[in-house]
């Protein structure tokens, strides 16, 4: 009996040194028939209750300020408690509410299944059969950065073209030439001839005769220079040649021959001048 009295005295002494909030937690655990628990459980429950009550009071203060109240009212605390319960302590809906939602959902018919469809699989992004890798080439081309390309001079190498039948010949690069055609001037020579008839008196027994002479005026004729606009140089020479002057002989009078002008056209080839442009 003395031992039991001493244990009760120790327990009562320990309870006196425990804070009032901790005593409330211990009494709640005792009512729930929780006999064995660690001492730190009480401290954890105290922290939880302190945080919960603080949040409730802060929300109640916000509601009171919104209603322009100077102090927190019981209605503000109840509203804050309901909002916190709906937000923190969520639970399933009531049975009759779930039944109504299920009836509405089941009234909607499912989409028909197409006959040509095979295995019903979700989209590719949700399947594990999709390819999520890429093959890497064994011989990857080397990539040069922009700075390396700018610092290195560029060289152009021309490979000779080899044919299967003929020998290999080096490939030469020929600069492109531009041909400029200059129209050639046309030179025309014009000569004029004059025919003169001179009368001569014969002897006493003979009759009189006439002498025909052909003369060309001008030492070299008239020179005319023209430029052909069609780049085709055609030279035309108009000349007149007189046949030799005949002398009159015999008694009845002599006849003379006159010169006939013949037009000669000669076509000259077109000359081309080549200018090499870089």
Curated annotation (Swiss-Prot):
Family matches, as SUPFAM superfamilies: Histone-fold
Domain of life from the UniProt record: Eukaryota
GO cellular component: a single term: transcription factor TFIID complex
Compositionally biased spans, kind Acidic residues: 269-278
Compositional bias annotation for Gly residues: 200-210, 241-259
GO BP term, pick one: transcription by RNA polymerase II
Molecular function terms, GO-annotated: protein heterodimerization activity; transcription coactivator activity; transcription coactivator binding
Keywords: Nucleus, Transcription, Transcription regulation
Region of interest (Disordered), residue spans: 193-278
Biased composition (Low complexity): 231-240
Localization annotation: Nucleus
Protein's job: TFIID is a multimeric protein complex that plays a central role in mediating promoter responses to various activators and repressors.
Subunit details: Belongs to the TFIID complex which is composed of TATA binding protein (Tbp) and a number of TBP-associated factors (TAFs). Taf9 and Taf6 exist as a heterotetramer. Interacts with e(y)2.
Swiss-Prot/TrEMBL domain comment: The C-terminus is important for mediating interaction with e(y)2.
PANTHER family in the record: TAF9 RNA POLYMERASE II, TATA BOX-BINDING PROTEIN (TBP)-ASSOCIATED FACTOR, TATA-BOX BINDING PROTEIN ASSOCIATED FACTOR 9
Family: Belongs to the TAF9 family.
Protein name: Transcription initiation factor TFIID subunit 9
């Amino acid at each position: 009996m003395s031992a039991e009295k001493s244990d009760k005295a120790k327990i009562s002494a320990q309870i006196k040194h425990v804070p009032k909030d901790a005593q409330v937690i211990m009494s709640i655990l005792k009512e729930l028939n929780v006999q064995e628990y660690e001492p730190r459980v009480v401290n954890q429950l105290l922290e939880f209750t302190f945080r919960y009550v603080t949040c409730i009071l802060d929300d109640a203060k916000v509601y009171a300020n919104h209603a322009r109240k100077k102090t927190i009212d019981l209605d503000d605390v109840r509203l804050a408690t309901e909002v916190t319960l709906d937000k923190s302590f969520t639970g399933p809906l009531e049975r009759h509410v779930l039944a109504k939602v299920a009836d509405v959902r089941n009234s909607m018919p499912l989409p028909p299944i197409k006959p040509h469809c095979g295995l019903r699989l979700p989209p590719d992004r949700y399947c594990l059969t999709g390819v999520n890798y890429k093959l890497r080439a064994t011989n990857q081309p080397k990539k040069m950065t922009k700075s390396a390309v700018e610092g290195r001079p560029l060289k152009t190498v021309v490979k000779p073209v080899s044919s299967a039948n003929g020998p290999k010949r080096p490939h030469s690069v020929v600069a492109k030439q531009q041909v400029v055609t200059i129209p050639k001037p046309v030179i025309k020579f014009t000569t004029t001839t004059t025919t003169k008839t001179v009368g001569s008196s014969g002897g006493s027994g003979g009759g009189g005769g006439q002498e025909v002479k052909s003369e060309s005026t001008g030492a070299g004729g008239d020179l005319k220079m023209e430029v052909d606009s069609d780049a085709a140089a055609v030279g035309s020479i108009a000349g007149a040649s007189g046949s030799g002057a005949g002398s009159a002989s015999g008694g009845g009078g002599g006849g003379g021959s006159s010169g006939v002008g013949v037009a000669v056209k000669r076509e000259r080839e077109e000359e081309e001048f080549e200018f090499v442009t870089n």
